[in-house]
């Protein structure tokens, strides 16, 4: 009720309005916004796990999440097994009697592996686990909660805000779980203090109004460039290409009108070539050499030395993350054919 907002770190009207909008988008009962994506993800895992518990996680995830699970939660007695999330038999084999959480990204960063959310949900139910999905790469394109995920997280910094001027995160889930996170006595979101600033919340809510239009354009442009890059003989990874190993799976899960998303990768063979190409593109004003994504301009980076740099080199190699890999977040260019011609020139 109005008048009950006693203390801004607990709650504010702007934060609650944004949370409700995001819950409606993801099809969950409610949501809790946070100061960053990591400020959303870390309390979820700490709320679900105690000392002695175990997590099974995808091996290809955002570097910060990987570092949190690999290096930080171990201090608290929480162990994680990293697996190839695309192989359900491997995932199942990693589950122990101490496992509490299955963790993945719907489309992984940066290799764009696609998680079988329905299959993972079946496993989670079989072993009484919580399936937590980071949906940052595919808002609107994929709806994890409708496919069986228990909890859906986002970095709002990326596509949802869309203008690279704000940091934020969200946890979407049941009213009961969100209440637990917000509990003033033992709620991880409440006590760890990653409160979103109310002005940020109002700003993101404003930008959300164009998300449906933006995602369609990101997807259209990315699909066009992926086709062209592949035809040019570049090793191109994009879920919308039939050559992508999970193309059919993505097709089955997707909300068709929003396409296959705005993220693609190409492998140019070496870090030198990757840097050369990225500098050339920046020089031609075709985008920015930057590690964020979901911006209205195209962004590109070499993940091995940026967003996945927390992952040790030998593990990067094992998961197929090579030096020559360039990750693209394709922008909202009005004439993507012209952009492609300028890239080629």
Language-model regions: role of each:
Residues 1-39, 64-71:
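Conserved N-terminal alpha-helix of the aminotransferase class I/II PLP-enzyme fold
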Residues 3, 29, 167, 200, ...:
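Short amphipathic alpha-helical segments
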Residues 30-237, 251:
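Conserved PLP-enzyme active-site core in the AAT-like
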Residues 70, 271-272, 279, 298-345:
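PLP-dependent enzyme catalytic core of the Aspartate aminotransferase-like
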Residues 162, 196, 255-258, 319-323:
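Short, flexible turn/loop "capping" segments at secondary-structure junctions
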Residues 204-213, 261-269, 327-331:
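Short, well-ordered beta-strand elements within core beta-sheets of diverse protein domains
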Residues 223-284, 288-296, 311-317:
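Conserved small-domain helix->loop->beta segment predominantly found in fold-type I
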């Amino acid at each position: 009720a109005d008048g009950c907002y006693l203390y801004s770190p607990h709650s504010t009207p702007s934060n609650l309005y944004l949370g409700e909008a995001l819950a409606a988008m993801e099809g969950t009962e409610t949501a809790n916004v946070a100061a960053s994506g990591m400020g959303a993800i870390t309390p979820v895992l700490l709320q679900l796990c105690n000392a002695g518990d175990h997590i099974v996680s995808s091996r290809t995830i955002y570097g910060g999440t990987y570092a949190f699970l690999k290096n930080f939660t171990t201090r608290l007695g929480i162990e994680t097994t990293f697996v190839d999330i695309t192989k359900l038999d491997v995932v199942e084999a990693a589950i122990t009697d101490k496992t509490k959480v299955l963790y993945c990204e719907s489309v992984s960063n940066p290799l764009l592996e696609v998680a079988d959310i329905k299959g993972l949900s079946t496993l989670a139910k079989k072993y009484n686990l919580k399936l937590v999905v980071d949906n940052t790469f595919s808002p609107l394109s994929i709806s994890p909660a409708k496919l069986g995920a228990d909890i859906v997280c986002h970095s709002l910094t990326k596509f949802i805000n869309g203008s690279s001027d704000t940091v934020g995160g969200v946890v979407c889930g049941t009213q009961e779980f969100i209440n637990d996170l917000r509990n003033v006595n033992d709620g991880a979101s409440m006590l760890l203090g990653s409160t979103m600033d109310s002005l940020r919340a109002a700003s993101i809510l404003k930008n959300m109004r164009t998300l449906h239009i933006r995602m369609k354009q990101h997807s259209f442009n990315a699909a066009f460039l992926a086709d062209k890059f592949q035809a040019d003989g570049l090793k191109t990874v994009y879920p919308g290409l039939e050559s992508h190993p999970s193309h059919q799976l993505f097709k089955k899960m997707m909300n068709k009108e929003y396409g296959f998303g705005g993220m693609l990768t190409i492998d140019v063979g070496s870090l030198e070539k990757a840097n050369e190409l990225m500098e050339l593109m920046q020089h031609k004003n075709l985008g920015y050499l930057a590690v964020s994504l979901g911006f209205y301009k195209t962004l590109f980076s070499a993940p091995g030395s940026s967003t996945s740099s927390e992952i040790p080199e030998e593990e990067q190699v094992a998961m197929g993350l090579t030096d020559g890999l360039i990750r693209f977040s394709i922008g909202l260019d009005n004439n993507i054919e012209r952009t492609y011609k300028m890239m080629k020139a």
